[in-house]
């Protein structure tokens, strides 16, 4: 990260919990969230939409059998908290699949590992699985249908003055999202 090189004295702590109060009450300066539900003491700046793809381990039966989102109902679906997937075809109407996850995890990393192990099918961010798809560790399912992307927000506390290092980090995150449209559009 260019930010770490520019600010070697700054301690970065990556926390993969969903507790937005950690930002509101000063434990963290900034959070990345896929929801804008927050208190009036926080600012949520829109960064873009995280591209998601549907993936499965190549040895899983679904890799050869799933041709349409409706086919997913017959398999174990893994979730990172959601119970609905919305699919948009290249042409035509969208389709919503409501499901009861066979397994639900509170973070993408765990869902990713479970998918790699063949536990089931998951909708995961493309940035997380791009290399696995290229190396044939995961198979992309129904590529003619796009999973509805998740909106991404940068959340931080309202203040009268923001330190330069925080402004720089905000700028670098915004720039990264703008220049990596295959992940965040």
Located regions from the model:
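Generic non-transmembrane alpha-helical segments
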Residues: 2-6, 172-180
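Central regulatory/effector-binding core of bacterial HTH transcription factors
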Residues: 1-40
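C-terminal regulatory
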Residues: 22-25, 37-152, 179-185
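Short amphipathic alpha-helical coupling segments at ligand-binding clamshell hinges
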Residues: 161-175
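Solvent-exposed beta-strand sheet faces enriched in polar/charged residues
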Residues: 13-17, 141, 155
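A bilobed periplasmic-binding-protein/Venus flytrap-type ligand-binding module shared by bacterial periplasmic
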Residues: 152-161
């Amino acid at each position: 990260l260019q930010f770490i090189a520019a600010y070697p004295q700054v301690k970065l702590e990556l926390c993969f919990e969903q507790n937005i109060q950690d930002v509101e009450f000063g434990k963290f300066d900034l959070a990345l969230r896929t929801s804008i539900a927050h208190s009036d003491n926080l600012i949520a700046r829109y960064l873009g939409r995280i591209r998601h793809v549907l993936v499965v381990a190549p040895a899983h039966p679904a890799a050869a059998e799933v041709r349409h989102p409706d086919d997913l109902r017959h398999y174990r679906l893994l979730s990172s908290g959601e119970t609905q997937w919305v699919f948009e075809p290249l042409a035509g109407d969208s389709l919503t699949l409501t499901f009861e996850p066979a397994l639900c995890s509170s973070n993408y990393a765990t869902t990713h590992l479970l998918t790699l192990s063949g536990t089931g099918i998951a909708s995961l961010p493309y940035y997380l699985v791009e290399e696995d798809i290229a190396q044939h560790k995961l198979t992309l399912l129904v590529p003619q249908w796009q999973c509805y992307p998740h909106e991404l927000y940068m959340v931080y506390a309202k203040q009268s003055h923001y330190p330069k290092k925080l402004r720089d980090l905000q700028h670098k995150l915004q720039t990264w999202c703008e220049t990596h449209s295959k992940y965040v559009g």
